[in-house]
UniProtKB/Swiss-Prot annotation:
Keywords: Antiport, Cell inner membrane, Cell membrane, Chloride, Ion transport, Membrane, Transmembrane, Transmembrane helix, Transport. This is H(+)/Cl(-) exchange transporter ClcA. The record marks E203 as: Mediates proton transfer from the protein to the inner aqueous phase. A motif (Selectivity filter part_1) lies at residues 106-110. A motif (Selectivity filter part_2) lies at residues 146-150. It comes from Yersinia pseudotuberculosis serotype O:1b (strain IP 31758). PANTHER family: CHLORIDE CHANNEL PROTEIN. It comes from the Bacteria. The lineage of its organism: Bacteria, Pseudomonadati, Pseudomonadota, Gammaproteobacteria, Enterobacterales. Chloride binds at S107, I356, F357, Y445. The gene is clcA. The chain crosses the membrane at residues 33-69, 77-100, 124-141, 148-166, 215-232, 253-281, 288-309, 330-349, 355-376, 422-438. Proton-coupled chloride transporter. Functions as antiport system and exchanges two chloride ions for 1 proton. Probably acts as an electrical shunt for an outwardly-directed proton pump that is linked to amino acid decarboxylation, as part of the extreme acid resistance (XAR) response. InterPro entries: Cl-channel_ClcA, Cl-channel_core, ClC.
Length: 478
């Protein structure tokens, strides 16, 4: 018996250790089933919200354009009508935000990041309707805003709504479903499930609490929201630019150069956004009437610009395939780029309910196409296709501004269905991110959140300072 025990002892000990490790790993994964079920519910709700919001914006825009088309032959009518309709739609969005849910202004993504750190409140009962209806107004007016910011915020708020409705008390459930809604919202906005997952894991890395529960919940929510989106809209790529040729290896240095350019552009772009936000705060000074009036003027301006040069306004998704196909000259591309930079800064910096993803992707496409056409002119021996630089530029500006290169790469590849361009995308986005970091630029959403928290603390300090001091006078008795 002693001999047998001594012979089996080393193997038995090793086997026992492996068994304990496996049991510990299995027992550690005590994922509450209710959280995973609720994650699926959050994904379905967010997907339905995304489809409704997308179709609602399209309907409002179509009705506005149809009304203008009916009076297109009457110049004395079409110009005033274009201004008035867009102004009224925009004013509705600004009014709802300023009067009922100030946290619904702007993109909304920084609000979700703040909520994940328990620094910002989540009032879903007012944010969801205000963001939905207000977004219909501002985006329907033709302002240079995107649909993805509202979808991320409404998705995150939907997650918190499910938590409150089903009375899930655990902090893990509250955090996981908030992140799930945000990821599902981005997935539903762009039909890009992997980008939705990466956005939460990479861009919100400082706020997201990594655990088996939260990762599973995010995956399930993104899957269900994507299924809902594709059930109603089909499985085609959201931006159809056709299949582009792969980039030859001897042209990769040009993509690195493009990334360097976009790194600098991203830092400057972010700085201009912050300056524009400060400028509008000085203009309205917190007075909601002035803010609504400013919003009406901006909306009316976009309505007029839509008649003059439609490519200068709108989210930009319709412009991307046209620009990537090389239908504009270099001079026209630069003109559109400058015009859209100005309109993007004005619309987003004013605090209108709407995102900046889509306008940013359009800007990257335009400048990338201009760079590609220039390279094709100076280096004809490479046989360059300008569209590949358009796709690379689309992700590069996002990577430099938001500081999430992996999300930018995957998002653009999923949206355009051009996965063969992954190598030039990596070179361009990594170069843009490194240059932006070297120049000291701050990630866009993190910087906006920091500014919001600073204003929150300042307002709190002002309230405390204005409270009357209570004097403790000694009580005397007889």
């Amino acid at each position: 018996m002693t001999h047998s025990t001594q012979q089996l002892s080393p193997e038995g000990v090793a086997e026992g250790k492996r068994g304990r490790l496996i049991r510990e790993l299995v027992n550690r994964d005590k994922t509450p089933l209710i959280i995973l079920i609720m994650a699926a519910v959050v994904g379905v709700v967010t997907g339905l919200l995304g489809v409704a919001f997308d179709r609602g914006v399209d309907w409002v825009q179509q009705q506005r354009l149809l009304a203008l088309a009916n009076v297109a032959d009457y110049a004395l009518l079409v110009w005033p009508l274009a201004f008035i309709m867009s102004a009224l739609l925009a004013m509705m969005g600004y009014f709802l935000v300023s009067r009922f849910a100030p946290e619904a202004g702007g993109s909304g993504i920084p609000e979700i990041e703040g909520a994940m750190e328990e620094m910002r409140p989540v009032r879903w009962w007012r944010v969801i309707p205000v963001k939905f209806i207000g977004g219909l107004g501002t985006l329907g007016a033709g302002m240079v805003l995107g649909r993805e910011g509202p979808m991320v915020q409404m998705g995150g708020n939907s997650g918190r709504m499910i938590v409150d409705i089903f009375r899930l008390r655990s902090p893990e459930a509250r955090h996981s479903l908030l992140a799930t809604g945000a990821a599902a919202g981005l997935s539903a906005a762009f039909n890009a499930p992997l980008a939705g997952i990466l956005f939460v894991i990479e861009e919100m890395r400082s706020q997201f609490r990594y655990s088996l529960v939260s990762i599973k919940a995010v995956f399930i929510g993104v899957i269900t929201s994507t299924i809902v989106y594709r059930y109603f809209n089909g499985e085609r790529a959201i931006i159809e630019v056709g299949k582009l040729s792969d980039a030859p290896l001897n042209t990769l240095w040009l993509y690195l150069l493009l990334g360097i350019i976009f790194g600098a552009v991203g830092v400057i772009f972010n700085a201009l956004i912050f300056r524009t936000q400060d400028m509008f705060v000085r203009f309205h000074g917190g007075d909601w009437r002035k803010l609504v009036l400013i919003g009406g003027l901006l909306g009316g301006m976009c309505g007029l610009l839509a008649l003059l040069h439609g490519n200068a306004v709108g989210g930009g998704f319709a412009l991307i395939p046209i620009a990537a196909a090389g239908n504009f000259s270099i001079g026209m591309l630069l003109f559109i780029f400058i015009a859209r930079v100005i309109t993007t800064l004005l619309c987003f910096g004013s605090g209108a309910p709407g995102g900046i993803f889509a306008p940013m992707l359009a800007l990257g496409t335009i400048l990338g196409t201009a760079f590609g056409l220039s390279c094709a002119h100076f280096f004809p021996q490479y046989g360059i296709e300008a569209g590949t630089f358009a796709i690379a530029g689309m992700g590069a500006l996002f990577a430099a501004s938001v500081r999430a290169p992996l999300t930018g790469i995957v998002l653009v590849l999923e949206m355009t269905d051009n996965y063969q361009l992954i190598l030039p995308m990596i070179v361009t986005c990594l170069g843009a991110t490194l240059i932006a970091q070297f120049m000291g630029g701050k990630p866009l959403y993190s910087a906006i959140l920091a500014r919001t928290l600073a204003k929150q603390e300042q307002a709190r300090a002002t309230v405390i300072a204005q409270e009357p001091a209570v004097e403790n006078t000694p009580q005397t008795g007889r």
